[in-house]
């Protein structure tokens, strides 16, 4: 894999079957792997595997479902899935790059606004996102 999560990564979104795209501050980067694979690889790149990161999350906040993952501590790279991480259509969002979020006119969508002014609709209700 040739991509690691970094402080400019806003989200990792699925595209075609088995592929995704990293949404960054200054553009989008196509990736030939799933969004979960990007998260797993990035955890390992920064020294601790994904399952260990999930276990740490559970230990501290008792979250098992759609739990945030600290990809890297010192840079505060924290990502969370908007649905089950095993779902191939899951979007992973950067916790620290989100400025605000609001209800969409569509019932099962939320508009997420990032620190750089970029916004995107994600396929999850406002109540679930909140």
Tell me the role of every PLM-derived stretch.
Residues 1-93, 97-130:
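Eukaryotic intrinsically disordered, low-complexity regulatory linkers and tails enriched in Ser/Thr/Pro
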């Amino acid at each position: 894999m040739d991509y690691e999560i970094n402080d400019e990564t806003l989200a990792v979104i699925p595209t075609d079957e088995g592929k995704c795209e990293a949404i960054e501050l200054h553009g989008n980067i196509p990736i030939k792997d799933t969004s979960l694979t990007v998260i797993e690889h990035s955890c390992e790149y920064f020294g601790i595997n994904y399952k260990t990161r999930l276990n740490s999350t559970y230990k501290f906040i008792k979250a098992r479902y759609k739990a945030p993952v600290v990809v890297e501590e010192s840079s505060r790279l924290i990502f969370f899935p908007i649905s089950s991480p095993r779902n191939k259509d899951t979007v992973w969002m950067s916790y620290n790059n989100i400025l605000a979020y609001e209800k969409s006119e569509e019932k099962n969508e939320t508009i997420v606004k990032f620190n750089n002014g970029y916004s995107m609709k994600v396929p999850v209700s406002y109540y679930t996102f909140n």
